[in-house]
Amino acid sequence: MNKGIERSVSVVLGAQWGDEGKGKLVDLLSESSTVVCRCQGGNNAGHTVVAGGKEYFFHLLPSGIINPNVLAIIGNGVVVNLEALFQEINEAVNKGLLDVASRLRISDRCHLVFPLHQEIDRMEEELRGLNLLGTTKKGIGPAYSSKVTRNGLRVCDLIGDWDQFTAKYKELVNYVKRRYPALEINVEESLEQLKTYREMLSGMVCDSVLLINKLTESKQTKILVEGAQSCMLDIDFGTYPHVTSSNCSIGGVCTGLGLSPSRVGSVYGVIKAYTTRVGSGPFPTELLDGIGEYIQKKGNEWGVTTKRMRRIGWLDTVVIRYAHIINDFNALALTKIDVLDGLKEVKIARAYVDPETGNELSSFPADPFILSRVVVIYETLPGWKASTQNCRVYDELPPAAKTFIETVEKLLNIPIRWIGTGASRDSIIIRSV
């Protein structure tokens, strides 16, 4: 046993169905970090950070790269669309971020997302007819499928022997064309583009497993891992089949970076003051009335990646307790409380009941049919008319808003350390809990 091990890694994870505002907490914590990492997912993720009057949208890059002093690492668990990556780098540079390419390291073990994966994603969704999963059509699922069927190509293949890469790429094309005869792929054109990306990757690719584990040995190094998507979209623990294709919970951090669990010091969960989800799937607290419409408009609830309108529901502590069982959060960040300003009353889901037996469910149901039928038991609290927007101190909040926060804490038995009160990076309350 290594008794001198440093628990220098902090992790930020979503505890709902994504879009919780993880970027805001990552932006804050990255100020005291030396390294920021992505561990899973691809450019189906979407993190938004507002800083210096500019709005930054991140899909593949760790959003903590906004801090000019950090090293950013894309870990082995991420699937990388190179066209999207370089486009994102250019957009970040054009908005004034410094030395983005020179501060970025990409794992040589990352699997690659090709246009053929995106086409397969689109075709598969069309084949589902009315039973849509709500995929982002970014090719993420098919890329992970290639990884699991062991015919995927990795960054190390692309930067290695070109003839070998060409042969492997053609094998992959032949494999998918046998299954999708309608798929049109210009192999030579694709290879020419990939050769360009191969040159552009120069200096960025590394053995990220070795790099990260060496970095954890230093007491001066503070590593921040930002999860993409969220626990309820986890391929194993989410509301399957309406999930993403990777592990978005704490296990995905370790496997997606080659990091021992013993290196992880703190795990922080991020929740909204209400709940949202994009695409299909059961949603027990969903609001299909004027209140839902009010929250949707006021919260500007549109997907960063998909541009689709997000579905709206009340805060669901059953979901968050389940996420806590899996991830063991040290503390929570509660975002967008300002969106609830002006409501006559606010509700918090505290339990699910089986509609046939009338019994409270003892665990979060794996079966989506059961989840779609549950009766939700709510705590109903008075709303508040006074604005919480841009509050910086807890005691500045209206009494009813504080009651809401403290009720959530009591129901979850997890401290809420951060409270988001607006879009700006400075619109946050930090509590000593």
Swiss-Prot record:
Binds 1 Mg(2+) ion per subunit. One of its GO terms (biological process) is 'de novo' AMP biosynthetic process. It comes from the Eukaryota. Its EC number is 6.3.4.4. SUPFAM superfamilies: P-loop containing nucleoside triphosphate hydrolases (SSF52540). The active site is at D19, H47. Pathway: Purine metabolism; AMP biosynthesis via de novo pathway; AMP from IMP: step 1/2. It is found in: Cytoplasm. It catalyses: IMP + L-aspartate + GTP = N(6)-(1,2-dicarboxyethyl)-AMP + GDP + phosphate + 2 H(+). Substrate binds at V304, T305, T306, K307, R308, M309, R310. Mg(2+) binds at D19, G46. Its cofactor is Mg(2+). GTP binds at residues 18-24, 46-48, 310, 336-338, 420-422. GO terms for molecular function: adenylosuccinate synthase activity; GTP binding; magnesium ion binding. Keywords: Cytoplasm, GTP-binding, Ligase, Magnesium, Metal-binding, Nucleotide-binding, Purine biosynthesis. GO terms for cellular component: cytoplasm. Homodimer. Belongs to the adenylosuccinate synthetase family. HAMAP family: Adenylosucc_synth. This is Adenylosuccinate synthetase.
